Amino acid sequence: MKYLIDTHTHTIASGHAYNTIDEMTRKAAQIGLPAIAFTEHTPKMPGSCGKLYFSNFKVLPREKFGVHRLFGCEANIMDYDGTLDMPDTLLEKMDGGDLSYL
């Protein structure tokens, strides 16, 4: 099977991974992965990124080392109403994301 994209990855910014965005992009290029999505944990996850981190995605190149890069988050569902721990104003600027129940 040939993989086209890894849609759920974390970097050192999430607090429990060991590689940078560029290191992971370079590895994706080495193994022939055409695309990778960075879905860092949102602020309610202890040790993770603050909101400022996510607002800065706009300055990152969407392609590097021949790999298409998507930037998003792994947001937490905070209650039974579906409230997320990331404001819509930031979610709208992201390429995508995942949801978890905290």
Q: What are these model-derived regions, one by one?
A:
Residues 48-102:
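Extended substrate/RNA-proximal surfaces in nucleic-acid metabolism proteins
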Residues 34-35, 39, 95:
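Short acidic/polar active-site loop segments enriched in Thr and Asp
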Residues 2-4, 36, 70:
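Hydrophobic "anchor" residues on beta-strands that sit immediately upstream
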Residues 8, 28, 40, 69, ...:
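Divalent metal-coordination and catalytic microenvironments
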Residues 22-36, 56-63:
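Alpha-helical scaffold segments that flank or form the walls of functional sites
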Residues 16-20:
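Glycine-rich anion/phosphate-binding loops
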Residues 12-14, 42-47, 77-79:
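Active-site environment of divalent metal-dependent phosphoester hydrolases
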Residues 4-14, 38-41:
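Histidine-centered catalytic micro-motifs
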